[in-house]
Every structure is written in C-alpha cells, then in structure tokens.
Amino acid sequence: YEPGGTLQIQHDVLKELGYPEINTIYDYEEAIKSYIEANPTTEDGQQRIGLSLMASDWRWLITTGNIASAALGIPDDGQFKVDDETGETTYKFTLPEIKEYFQWLNHMNDIGLLDPESFTQKEDTYKAKISSGRVVGLSDAAWDYSDAEKTLLSEGKAGSTYARLPVTVSEEYK
C-alpha cells in the first residue's frame, strides 16, 4: 500500500518547521510560505517554487481536478461524485463546495506561491524542476513524479523528496 495523499511537501520543510500538523490547504500554504521566506533559494542558488502542478495536458485531472475533489473528501469516481446510498451521480466540477479549492489555487497564484507555468509547462520541464529540489510542494500522483524523486535520492537529496499529506479544504472534510 502506498498512500497518495492529496498534497505533497518536501521532507526538509517538515523537519525545519518542527513537523507541524498540516490538515487543511491553509495549513499547507502556511508551511510553504514560512519555509520559502526562510529559504528563498536552494543550496545552489536556484529560486524555490512553492507549489507546482502538471496541468497543461491530460494530467490536469490528476494534479488539479482529482485533488480538488479529494480535498473535499470525495472518492475518485472519475469526474463524478456518487452518492453511495442513492447511486445519484453529480459532475463534481459543478459542486458549489469545489469552488473553494480553485479559489485557493488562484490565491496561491496571487501571492506568488503557485508556479506560473503550472498550466502551460511540459512534462520534461515539470520533472526537471522537481529533480532540482526547487519545488517545495506538489499536487500529484506518486507515479507521475517518482522518477524525479529517484534523481533526488541518487544525488543524496532525500530531504527534497515528498511526504504525502491527507490535506483537506477545511476541518469539516475527512
């Protein structure tokens, strides 16, 4: 079993911040913000990136859509929320509560913590950023960034690999 989590953050961040509880997207944001304020660049002088997504192609569903619903406690039933008792299905992107997650991403962009290339970058660019150790946070499936983590490990940068966190939009979601 390998937990996916909804959002991932570098192990170094957790260590430096004293292993804080990160339960909501707002806790996650605060951890990224605090870490980047204290460590704006990597050891080799590269500017850190708060949160990067791979949303320029079909993976938008993996790094944006699925995560948005998971952060609301909605199981991954494709692009739908299924009521287990009635069988009623709803296209998840029409749910009013999903809006808060996308507003949060917009806010992350506004404050400079969302990689501005998140919705335009190509896969090789995305993985190169992760492999460099610059990307503090991810919103992705482990299978999509595991090769980049292998590069980090081969370079002795285990602290730049990612802890998978069960982050939700707010405490009301499980």
Predicted regions and their residues:
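Extracytoplasmic/secretory soluble proteins
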Residues: 1-174
